[in-house]
Amino acid sequence: MQKTSFASKNTTGQMKKADVILGLQWGDEGKGKVVDVLTPRYEVVARFQGGPNAGHTLEFGGEKYILRSIPSGIFQGGKTNIIGNGVVLDAILFRAEAEELAKSGHDLTKQLCISKKAHLILPTHRMLDAAYEAAKGSAKIGTTGKGIGPTYT
């Protein structure tokens, strides 16, 4: 489940407002569309939990992008984008996503901060995910197989 929060500061540098978008269903409620509408109003866009199990499709400047890990505030110049402690990152998917954005001129080094405490999905997590799902037989839950659950445990 992807969760995103926003924050803005007043002229004295104090936090004046923070809004949080939570997915309370099964993770595919259209949070991304709400995030896209709200990001221009905030200085900080942060993902604080979730992983790359779904893609958020966006169109900016006539180009189509699919974001799985990077907050969509990256398209709003001058915004700080944060990947927080509770996020699980797949380094391979993250790198591909970052390279696509870099090709289009989005400088992640100036707009993106990643917590040192964010969790990394390893190949063993994906293998465990598949094994746990297979072991459940007809009681399986329909995991995406991306290793997100085992990374959190």
Where are these regions (language model features)?
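Non-transmembrane, aqueous-exposed alpha-helical and coiled segments at domain scale
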Residues: 6-153
